[in-house]
């Protein structure tokens, strides 16, 4: 089969190492085998390796592979999952031995260009610090309304390789959500259109700094049409240096020529048309400025491949917000509880908090090198209280002490976290739980403490500004845990006097 696909025929009979036995790693196995490659998968998780073995791959625990350093040089290619940092020992060893390293998205691109599963698709790439999933799902809804065979894939839906292999029905366009991790390992990708929604501090521990993070995001702009959020300082700064054939901006205000924007209550296109109305701004979900920005980006990508205005309107009208994205959970005792667990960095938490007049903020987790001072300064006037949990809770507490000292703060701590001695003076109350308290029980305490700080008319908002993996399996697990805990409240839990 590989002789028919000249771009990858060099892999026939060659040994390829897949780094990571998760979803993206498993999706790599079958295409590599279709190309005639000899596939070995490595991971620390023996159960995941067993699943890969059932798919026909050889497997080796990563510690065993690292112990046999010379063995890595025997591979013709390493295809890495996005979870591996550039300085991971395995990848450093491969690079030192001169072994090419591709991410799963890079491999997907080459597979598609080589025609392994039919003529190449049109890739519509979405990236940004926040709003990627919402924008991609909006885009997919628009493509469906246009009756264009398409699939949402990448960080949303299914791996890109699985989308390429799906032939019944065959997707002609792919709505591809990509993270900075995936783009870092995908230097060859040239999308039909690619969008950067916004860029703020996130994943700096993985990238090693802000500029490498920006550089990774900018790889979405290397195709035919680049789409940039002009209301975002960092994203808009990339406009003049965009290597795309055509660069289009979008903004919340009235659009200039070459832009999409909002005018007289409508999303308006002055990039691919002369001021054509695309859809009413009212009714976009999720509501608010962030939702409108996502809708404009999705519309721009769709318009870049000729989707008509009526399909944009129909797709946005049909769009349903995914879970854990500013979702209303319940109202208890006059207090509204909102799950925005998807707000995994300070930039994402900001609009979630500012959407409400008075907020008891639930925050904490893994900050991933991001700073919260700017966020706290901006939202301080809205805060009726804060309840903090997770590994980096004290960093948020310290920021509250500096910029919102009048805001009552509760810290819910377990294990080693309870031994932190430098508790900021704003901490009105500390709750110290046994080290073996499970995450759902911790969230139950957090929600009760938040209810205690709230009064009728307030909103308790889970907008953690941090990743979840220090305590929860995912942001979805964290949001579900919050929802379950809210379900156990009654009106008597609201506005208790702090102990």
Swiss-Prot record:
Q: Which UniProt keywords apply?
A: ATP-binding, Cell cycle, Cell division, Cell shape, Cell wall biogenesis/degradation, Cytoplasm, Ligase, Nucleotide-binding, Peptidoglycan synthesis
Please name one Pfam family that this protein belongs to.
AlaDh_PNT_C
Report whether Cell inner membrane shows up as a keyword of the record: no
Q: Where does ATP bind?
A: 128-134
Give the enzyme's EC designation: 6.3.2.9
Which compartment or compartments is the protein found in? Cytoplasm
UniProt GO MF annotations: ATP binding; UDP-N-acetylmuramoylalanine-D-glutamate ligase activity
Task: Cite the InterPro entries for this sequence.
Answer: AlaDH/PNT_NAD(H)-bd, Mur-like_cat_sf, Mur_ligase_C_dom_sf, Mur_ligase_cen, MurD
Q: In which pathway does it act?
A: Cell wall biogenesis; peptidoglycan biosynthesis
What's the main place this protein lives?
cytoplasm
Domain of life here?
Answer: Bacteria
GO-annotated biological processes:
cell division; cell wall organization; peptidoglycan biosynthetic process; regulation of cell shape
What are its GO cellular component terms? cytoplasm
Catalyses which reaction(s): UDP-N-acetyl-alpha-D-muramoyl-L-alanine + D-glutamate + ATP = UDP-N-acetyl-alpha-D-muramoyl-L-alanyl-D-glutamate + ADP + phosphate + H(+)
The EC class name is ligase
Q: What does this protein do?
A: Cell wall formation. Catalyzes the addition of glutamate to the nucleotide precursor UDP-N-acetylmuramoyl-L-alanine (UMA).
Question: What is the similarity comment for this entry?
Answer: Belongs to the MurCDEF family.
Protein name per Swiss-Prot or TrEMBL: UDP-N-acetylmuramoylalanine--D-glutamate ligase
Mind giving the lineage of the organism this protein is from?
A: Bacteria, Bacillati, Actinomycetota, Actinomycetes, Mycobacteriales
